[in-house]
């Protein structure tokens, strides 16, 4: 059966400040979402992360965000759809320069943090993001949050002529609408390796998850986000890769 592509946010260090264990995670993922300088990263880190992805045969994705270094891109900004379109184009282009220097290309786009969440709530911001992708390269997929009702996003993507990849998360709790539970809520982030792997396998099989109110939730899963922030999360990524390799042999 087709399995979701494993993606991971990477290149999120900045200067001497280190974020994530990119070297340890890269061998186990299919796609690297590389920060483009607005919420994290700098030119040197962007290029080194692209080179690391090339070394391991991993697809490079642009990970654009609101201009919010202090808040790590997790704060919503009052931006118009045109402003979202322009800031995304700017960031995709910056990463593409690093990709060309390392013999590869940007393969998809995954917005970050508050921008990603705002796009899921506001169709006009999503339309702005889609215009950015179309202006840059109409063949690039755009990652969007999987929800319990993906039909409106699918309809807009068909109208605009954009390929959507619906994204799910192995280590996050969901509400009944299929939205991520706020990180401020208890239990929003899973830390137990077995629970993370079990959720990943459930999503890969197309089986229902249990939402935070106990209801069953069906989510489309073209790609699955994993994290490599610490040694425990890296171990979980390795375990998910092993589990997916087992599913591929079934």
Swiss-Prot record:
Pfam families reported in the protein's UniProt record: LamB_YcsF
GO MF term (any one): ATP binding
One Gene Ontology term from the biological process aspect of the record: carbohydrate metabolic process
InterPro entries in UniProt: Glyco_hydro/deAcase_b/a-brl (IPR011330), LamB/YcsF/PxpA-like (IPR005501)
CDD domains for the chain: LamB_YcsF_like
Keywords: ATP-binding, Hydrolase, Nucleotide-binding
EC number: 3.5.2.9
Catalytic activity line of the entry: 5-oxo-L-proline + ATP + 2 H2O = L-glutamate + ADP + phosphate + H(+)
Transmembrane residue ranges: none
Domain of life of the source: Bacteria
Family label: Belongs to the LamB/PxpA family.
Binding partners and assembly: Forms a complex composed of PxpA, PxpB and PxpC.
Known function: Catalyzes the cleavage of 5-oxoproline to form L-glutamate coupled to the hydrolysis of ATP to ADP and inorganic phosphate.
Name the UniProt record assigns to this protein: 5-oxoprolinase subunit A
Top-level taxonomy: Bacteria, Pseudomonadati, Pseudomonadota, Gammaproteobacteria, Oceanospirillales
């Amino acid at each position: 059966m087709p399995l979701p592509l494993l993606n991971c946010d990477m290149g999120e260090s900045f200067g001497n400040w280190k974020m994530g264990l990119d070297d340890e995670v890269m061998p186990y993922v299919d796609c690297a979402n590389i920060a483009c300088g607005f919420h994290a990263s700098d030119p040197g880190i962007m290029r080194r992360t692209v080179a690391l992805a090339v070394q391991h045969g991993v697809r490079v994705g642009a990970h654009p965000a609101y201009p919010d270094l202090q808040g790590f891109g997790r704060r919503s900004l009052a931006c118009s759809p045109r402003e979202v379109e322009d800031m995304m184009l700017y960031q995709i282009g910056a990463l593409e320069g690093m990709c060309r220097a390392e013999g590869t290309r940007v393969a998809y786009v995954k917005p970050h943090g508050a921008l990603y969440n705002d796009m899921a709530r506001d169709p006009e911001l999503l339309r702005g993001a889609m215009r950015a992708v179309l202006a840059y390269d109409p063949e690039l997929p755009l990652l969007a949050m999987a929800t319990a009702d993906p039909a409106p996003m699918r309809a807009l993507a068909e109208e605009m002529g954009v390929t959507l990849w619906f994204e799910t998360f192995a280590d996050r709790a969901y509400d009944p609408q299929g939205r991520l539970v706020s990180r401020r809520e208890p239990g929003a982030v899973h830390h137990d390796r077995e629970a993370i792997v079990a959720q990943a396998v459930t999503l890969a099989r197309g089986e229902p998850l249990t939402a935070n109110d106990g209801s069953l939730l069906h989510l489309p899963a073209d790609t699955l986000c994993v994290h490599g922030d610490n040694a425990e999360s890296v171990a979980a990524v390795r375990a998910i890769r092993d589990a997916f390799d087992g599913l591929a042999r079934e």
